[in-house]
Amino acid sequence: MADRRNLFFFYGDDKAKLVEKMKPIYRILEENGFTILDHPKNANAIVSVGDDATFLQAVRKTGFREDCLYAGISTKDEISFYCDFHIDHVDIALQEITKNEIEVRKYPTIEVDVDGSTSFHCLNEFSLRSSIIKTFVVDVHVDNLYFETFRGDGLVVSTPTGSTAYNKSLRGAVVDPLIPCFQVSELASLNNNTYRTLGSPFILNHERTLTLKLRPDGNDYPVIGMDNEALSIKQVEKAVVRLSDKQIKTVKLKNNSFWEKVQRTFL
């Protein structure tokens, strides 16, 4: 981090108020040899100011850059999964940086291809949900194997870091980010003699390919979720999901591991 001194700050809500609060921090950073940029193009460190949702937006809006470090500053009551620093204690963060008390961790992403025409990455999860009050039908394939036919409200495919988010609310497993994999969870599946699914989340390793083929039954206009954004596509035939080679490098304090965050948040 000490060698990455071109900083771009990404703000969520209340930008004007937060920029004003960050001005003393800007001065401290500049006094310590950092340069504050107005555009992310020439930045080698991108800092989100807000919450985890702001961090996800910062990564997406700056193109999932692999040549940058990402860091999160929380403006909420406490630090969170993607925010290792708090806006009221950035001076402590600077001390940690100068003492080399921070580490760089890499978070995996998933790559999604929709009908061979639209592709994107997700840091947390990709979701495919019915856009109307009606179930839809999806044929699920793992690699070249037809695996199951799902009928229900939707499917969620999460990364290990995303396993603590939407996935966890669906009773999915919390997965260590050091394991290269992705997880598939169901939203209100209908199981009967015609449609039968595994009925539980399942985890695929980094070499697997997941293909979701929608049945053209009049409900093939789903809502596609990319982390905390929705993608507008009129009609979908299939979505292909893989674990991407692209990883996001983030800054972490040495005493703030993924499992310490899980413990602090849920236990």
From Swiss-Prot:
EC primary class: transferase
Organism in which the protein naturally occurs: Bacillus cereus (strain ATCC 10987 / NRS 248)
Catalysis performed (reactions): NAD(+) + ATP = ADP + NADP(+) + H(+)
Listed name of the protein: NAD kinase 2
Disulfide bonds: none
Gene: nadK2
Gene3D superfamilies: Probable inorganic polyphosphate/atp-NAD kinase, domain 1, Probable inorganic polyphosphate/atp-NAD kinase, domain 2
UniProt-listed SUPFAM superfamilies: NAD kinase/diacylglycerol kinase-like
Origin superkingdom: Bacteria
UniProt keyword annotations, A-Z: ATP-binding, Cytoplasm, Kinase, NAD, NADP, Nucleotide-binding, Transferase
InterPro entries: ATP-NAD_kinase_N, ATP-NAD_kinase_PpnK-typ_C, NAD/diacylglycerol_kinase_sf, NADK
Catalytic residues (positions): 52 (proton acceptor)
